[in-house]
Amino acid sequence: MRVTKELLIKNAEEVVRSQADADSSLVAAYLTGSLLTESPLLGNTTDIDLVFVHAGLTEEREFLRLTEDIHLDIQHYPKNVFEPARNLRADPWLGTSIFNAKPIYDPDHFIDFIQASVRGMYHLPEN
């Protein structure tokens, strides 16, 4: 089977959909990392970077192996880490992650709101 960017995104969407059905605390999920670039594969290997936002506390990180060459790297955060959203502009890890994110699961537009807040004035020196 030929691994393509589209196939990887489809796999990510299926995992998120399955998780959303199984976990009522899931508020949102977004894709980040190399899969959002032009060339996400290094050779024929890659990982799929996902961020899950939960209503409350949860485990921090998990790794799931889809195939020998493809892994899911899932970071879990409680919703309150993203509030207030404007503070994320100065956060080198989450700010960049959410700025470039591709929302996959966002029924209440939580990620949309956070992205709008982060992207506003993001490139000013104080941020």
Regions inferred by a protein language model and the residue ranges of each:
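A generic local structural motif
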Residues: 14-18, 36-38, 59, 90
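Catalytic metal-binding acidic patch
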Residues: 32-77
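Conserved NTP/Mg2+-binding pocket subregion across the NTase superfamily
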Residues: 4, 62-127
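Helical scaffold of the NTase/Pol beta-like nucleotidyltransferase catalytic core
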Residues: 1-29
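A short linear-motif detector with a strong N-terminal bias
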Residues: 7-11, 28-32, 44, 51-54, ...
